[in-house]
Amino acid sequence: MKLPIYLDYSATTPVDPRVAQKMSECLLMDGNFGNPASRSHVFGWKAEEAVENARRQVAELVNADPREIVWTSGATESDNLAIKGVAHFYSGKGKHIITSKIEHKAVLDTCRQLEREGFEVTYLEPGEDGLITPAMVEAALRDDTILVSVMHVNNEIGTINDIAAIGELTRSRGVLFHVDAAQSTGKVEIDLDKLKVDLMSFSAHKTYGPKGIGALYVRRKPRVRIEGQMHGGGHERGMRSGTLATHQIVGMGEAFRIAREEMAQESAHVLALRDRFFAQIDGLEELYINGSMTSRVPHNLNVSFNYVEGESLIMALKDLAVSSGSACTSASLEPSYVLRALGRNDELAHSSIRFTFGRFTTEEEIDYAAQKVVEAVSKLRELSPLWDMYKEGVDLSQVEWQAH
């Protein structure tokens, strides 16, 4: 077993060796290195063929038409393109957008930017289970609402929103529906033929593909229009200009092909690992699971250890690669805005750790990690005067702390 142990699969995944092999065939002089937009020679034709094959592979995972897949640089760009693209195109119809407080920053900050441009955004608050319900969305809908953006799987707590029910609601009201699915490909079944979803963002690097490539699903029937945000040569039917990176795209296609074929067995494998891990740490007192355990992907376990500071716990677990909050915001020492939105107090939000498991995690690693967590939590609590007070029966919420 190699140390450190990687348990941060929701931050990124390693590229699957089969994906790396396909990518390496699109780089060198004797490989498929051409520009897919070069129409006058065989190098361009071959590259275009590889790109279209990958487009089909991505579409097949989510049961979409390949013509509905637009290549982007990742889910952040896809979120920006979907939300700004719809807002700018349909602003004559209305200027109201609905999203939730627990979306990824790529959605929240895009909405903040639109607010500066004069749009109005309603931010829904989840229940303490971390879920956004159709009833919450319905209550926020207005005559001038043009877009609802709700994530499929939350990146911090792994909860799964009922996008099928939300889609039925938005379609019946003539409102476009965007879903950030960066964390759900290869984890949850997605059928865009059945779902009433108009736009969906995808990322390769959360699904054992390379970083720097993603896609946006844009529905054709009923047709969804978006205004391109990247101007240039008019690639991707004008929705996203820029030379297509054949090697990245081929990597994403292969990653999504593997996800489609191996999803069922992989989810079972990961669920068994998570249950094994949780069974070994469940004996710890004052342990709180963040988010619903029933409507949740098997890959995620987000736990708060009361009376332990999350940052010091991460330092104590130097052989484990885990995170507090999402990778994009874990550098800030603010408590997770997702956990705050669930109603967790600052202490519990600060003491949370996200363990995310994946394709290459082994039982041996799980057992080692669980043992280290139990040891570290117990040791840090021994050093904590708050823990002593709690054990003595002091109600810490009633204590008045003296300011110095």
UniProtKB/Swiss-Prot annotation:
Q: Taxonomically, which superkingdom?
A: Bacteria
- Choose one Gene Ontology CC annotation of this protein and give it: L-cysteine desulfurase complex
Provide the positions where the record notes the PTM N6-(pyridoxal phosphate)lysine. K206
Reaction(s) catalyzed by this protein?
(sulfur carrier)-H + L-cysteine = (sulfur carrier)-SH + L-alanine
Sorted alphabetically, which Pfam families does this protein's record hold?
Aminotran_5
Its EC number(s): 2.8.1.7
Compartments in which it is found = Cytoplasm
Can you tell me which residues form the catalytic site?
C328 (cysteine persulfide intermediate)
- This protein's record includes keyword Metal-binding: yes
BP GO annotations = [2Fe-2S] cluster assembly
Q: Name one GO molecular function term.
A: cysteine desulfurase activity
Keywords attached to this Swiss-Prot or TrEMBL record, sorted alphabetically, are: 2Fe-2S, Cytoplasm, Iron, Iron-sulfur, Metal-binding, Pyridoxal phosphate, Transferase
Obligatory cofactor(s): pyridoxal 5'-phosphate
Q: Please give the chief subcellular localization of this protein.
A: cytoplasm
Which pathway features in its UniProt record? Cofactor biosynthesis; iron-sulfur cluster biosynthesis
Binding residue positions for [2Fe-2S] cluster: C328
What residues does pyridoxal 5'-phosphate bind to? A75, T76, N155, Q183, S203, A204, H205, T243
UniProt lists the family membership as follows: Belongs to the class-V pyridoxal-phosphate-dependent aminotransferase family. NifS/IscS subfamily.
How this chain assembles, per its entry, is: Homodimer. Forms a heterotetramer with IscU, interacts with other sulfur acceptors.
Question: Function of this protein?
Answer: Master enzyme that delivers sulfur to a number of partners involved in Fe-S cluster assembly, tRNA modification or cofactor biosynthesis. Catalyzes the removal of elemental sulfur atoms from cysteine to produce alanine. Functions as a sulfur delivery protein for Fe-S cluster synthesis onto IscU, an Fe-S scaffold assembly protein, as well as other S acceptor proteins.
**Protein's name according to its UniProt entry:** Cysteine desulfurase IscS
Its taxonomic placement starts with: Bacteria, Pseudomonadati, Pseudomonadota, Gammaproteobacteria, Pseudomonadales
